[in-house]
A protein has these predicted regions:
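Charged catalytic cores and adjacent phosphate/nucleic-acid-binding surfaces used
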Residues: 115-192
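Hydrophobic, aromatic-enriched interface-forming segments
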Residues: 78-116
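Alpha-helix N-cap and loop-to-helix initiation/capping positions
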Residues: 1-7, 75-86, 115-122, 148-155
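Generic alpha-helical structural signal
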Residues: 6-9, 13, 85-88, 125, ...
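Acidic (Asp/Glu)-rich catalytic clusters
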Residues: 9-21, 41-50, 95-99, 127-135, ...
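Hydrophobic faces of well-ordered beta-strands that scaffold small-molecule active sites
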Residues: 24-28, 52-54, 102-104, 138-140, ...
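A metal-dependent hydrolase metal-coordination microenvironment
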Residues: 1-64, 69, 74-77, 81-82, ...
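Active-site beta-loop-alpha junctions enriched in small/polar residues
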Residues: 27-33, 57-59, 107-111, 141-145, ...
Length: 192
């Protein structure tokens, strides 16, 4: 299979023989769902990456971020508060799974600027508390801003501040799928 995990491992081994002016680490972003946690655990234990990023890309079996169909299949058929609650429930389980070193784009569910219908601050506090307890990093990811024009450049300001208050390590990320998106919009993020 082209672009398989084996191809990636071969690339890592080849690159580890090279010398770079910066520290280069190799990791993997893994799509997490509570239903696939045991499968992920059985697969991931066979690999040794420098880091593993766990991300939630779907809610109730539907991708929440695909312009072509997410609004039709998910957002227009469900109460936004239920979507947000399911998303953050999955984030909670991702953290508690102990499979990952960091959470990818932990508040990207906001990308379409749809009102959740409830105050997210208790959720932010709960997620921050869990992140601290499980010693997992949280991403301050710029992709919702540059891809979906969300006004938040990275994390919601209140969420970021709550994470900082809880001494949760925050990792800057751009979710680059193309070289041109590496570090995109980092200059707009609040200085740490």
């Amino acid at each position: 299979q082209k672009n398989s995990i084996d191809d990636y491992l071969k690339l890592i081994e080849a690159l580890k023989k090279e010398t770079f002016d910066i520290d280069v680490r190799f990791g993997l972003e893994v799509c997490y769902t509570p239903e696939t946690e045991s499968l992920l655990s059985s697969i991931l234990k066979n690999y040794h990456f420098d880091f593993l990023v766990g991300s939630v890309h779907s809610v109730n079996g539907y991708l929440y971020d695909m312009d072509a169909f997410s609004k039709i299949l998910l957002w227009n058929k469900n109460d936004p508060s239920d979507i947000y609650k399911s998303y953050y429930d999955s984030i909670e389980k991702l953290i508690q799974s102990n499979l990952f070193d960091q959470v990818g784009h932990p508040d990207v569910i906001k990308m379409y600027s749809i009102d959740p219908g409830y105050d997210l601050h208790p959720t932010y506090h709960h997620i921050a508390s869990l992140a601290k307890e499980y010693n997992i990093k949280m991403e301050d990811n710029t992709k919702a801003h540059y891809s979906y024009h969300h006004p938040d450049v990275g994390l919601n300001d209140d969420f970021r501040n709550i994470l900082k208050e809880n001494n949760v390590q925050i990792v800057t990320a751009s979710d680059a799928h193309y070289p041109s998106d590496v570090a995109r919009c980092f200059e707009l993020l609040d200085p740490r």
